[in-house]
């Protein structure tokens, strides 16, 4: 007999296996960053990037998560990284959410076709019509350095992102110095 908890565990473990793994070249995309502007992933080539997929604007956990990342922007920038949030909400919804939360990083609308980018990154929840709460650290060459899929109701915090960015920075410094 399957319990709700075991079904959740199965769904969670399946979603974790489907997220793009380390070393995978990330698919480029173009999404709305405002109702009249577009942003492409390729604009960030040459620098580390944090992609934070989240289920929906205005949900309590998503609001707390994006607010935390806004507070951590200086640390991300100090480690050479930019931050982008992505959900299936529309650009107008993102604009209101970002204004309300005083966010200072782009929120991209994976709205039409709904969830297309999340699907390509392996983090779309077909049953719910939203993306997983998934994090990717992408290196300057456009490959996944680190990824994590959090349970949908849990704020993953920023520690994993910071650790991955520090590790990436250390790796890059060793490569630049000619050591491995």
Question: PLM ranges: what are they?
Answer:
Residues 1-180:
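Chalcogenol-based redox active-site neighborhoods
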């Amino acid at each position: 007999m399957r319990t709700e908890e075991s079904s959740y565990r199965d769904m969670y473990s399946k979603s974790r296996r489907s997220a793009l793994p380390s070393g995978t070249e990330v698919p480029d995309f173009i999404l709305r960053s405002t109702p009249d502007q577009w942003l492409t992933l390729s604009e960030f080539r040459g620098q580390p990037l944090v992609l934070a997929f989240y289920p929906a604007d205005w949900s309590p956990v998503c609001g707390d998560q994006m607010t935390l990342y806004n507070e951590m922007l200086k640390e991300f920038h100090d480690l050479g990284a930019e931050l982008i949030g992505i959900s299936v909400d529309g650009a107008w919804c993102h604009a209101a959410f970002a204004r309300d939360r005083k966010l200072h990083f782009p929120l991209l609308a994976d709205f039409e076709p709904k969830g297309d980018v999340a699907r390509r990154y392996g983090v779309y929840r077909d049953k719910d019509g939203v993306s997983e709460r998934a994090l990717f650290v992408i290196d300057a060459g456009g490959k996944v350095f680190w990824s994590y899929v959090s349970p949908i109701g849990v704020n993953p915090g920023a520690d994993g992102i910071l650790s991955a960015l520090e590790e990436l920075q250390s790796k890059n410094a060793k490569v630049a110095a000619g050591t491995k």
